[in-house]
Amino acid sequence: MASHAAAKAPSRRRVHTRNRLLAAAYEVFAAEGFGRATVEKVCERAGFTRGAFYSNFTSLDELFLAMWEQRSAELLTDVRAALDEISVDGVTDVRAAVDGLLRAVPLDDAWFRITAEFTAHALRTPALRRVMAAREEAIVAALMPTVVAALARAGRTVADPVALGQALVAVHDGTAAQVLMEPDNAAVHRRRAELFCHVVLAYSTPNGG
């Protein structure tokens, strides 16, 4: 038993180290920007050596992608939980479902800044751009079955889940900056919710319709 536990200990330590580095990187990226971040700054914030960093990640790019996957998994969990809790019954309740979902998954100012900077960095790096595009497609593909199921409970059918997913991402990305710039502006929040509703209704049809 003791030897079995000892064999597992390094794996647990590695997971702990990796999570500490991810948390430290989030703080460094948010405070200084991705472009100004360095491996040394991340290690200093985490309390680890460069060796600990390079035993887990090959670069800051790889670290960011791991962070993105981690936060995407958390987002998927939150969205699924929110949609499962929302009772929808017909078209008139789609807005209520959207409002509930937006409340359950609020925007993160720091994360928006981090992803905006990294996206600009990726656009200058073709290989990285392809990786980001593929991972975003995977995230949307993982999310859409939950969205489609929620709409089915509302009596609506989605003919093209991929198109709906891309449209929802576009609305999210396009309105996030407005909401974060004017967090207390009720009209901005209302328009964001209305745009989500318009997209959902445009890319779905009533059952039997």
Q: Could you tell me what each predicted segment is?
A:
Residues 129-133, 150-209:
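Hydrophobic/aromatic-rich alpha-helical bundle segments in the mid-to-C-terminal region
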Residues 57, 64-71:
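Alpha-helical DNA-contacting segments of helix-turn-helix folds
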Residues 46-57:
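Short hydrophobic/aromatic patch on the recognition helix
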Residues 66, 79-111, 158-168:
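Hydrophobic alpha-helical connector segments
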Residues 14, 68, 72, 129-140, ...:
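Amphipathic, non-transmembrane alpha-helical scaffold segments
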Residues 99-106, 113-124, 200:
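Helix-loop "lid/cap" segments that line or gate small-molecule binding pockets
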Residues 76, 107-116, 126-152, 194:
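Amphipathic alpha-helical packing segments from all-alpha helical-bundle domains
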Residues 1-32, 36-48, 62:
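Basic, helix-initiating cap at the start of DNA-binding domains
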